[in-house]
Amino acid sequence: MKRGNISRKVAASVMTGAMMVSMAGMSVCAAPIVGDGDHAIEAVPVQKTVATDGHIYAPDTSFSFRVANGGEGTFEGNVVSAGVTGGLAADENAVFTPSGTTPLVSYTSNGSLAVDGSVFTSPGVYHYLVTEASGDYEGMDYDNSTYDVYLYVYNSNNGLYVGNAVSVKNGDKADLAFTN
């Protein structure tokens, strides 16, 4: 009887350890990476959050984003080339429209950046810088963060394609998310 209890405790400990290891792996894998590398991606999502004091409705405006070619260097052991113009471009703005009967403490909208694999001439990792464009909406603060975005260009039988995009803020992988 004691042996059965010990076996159950050991099994429970092993299962707990396995769950902890698998959960740790999930947090690493949940990094802000778009694409699986095997298929071409066409867009990179960008999120905009407007925080309020809870007494203001969503602003009736949109927020746009800017993309600039980044410089050469290294990222995660890969040689990185400067971005190629047109490989990553601002596409859809994050649009807000007042609605509802109760103001919220924050409002979130999504925009996107367009990916164009046809502009690349060789496989590799390409670097871009993404920022929020400052606007003139009265009383609005704009996020001055800069994200490094790395596009991974692969070669297949059908030619070059962008299979992954990784966004980084202050040296850490992070979703492309701007907050006022």
For every predicted segment, state its role.
Residues 2-180:
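Solvent-exposed loop/turn and edge beta-strand elements of beta-rich ligand-binding domains
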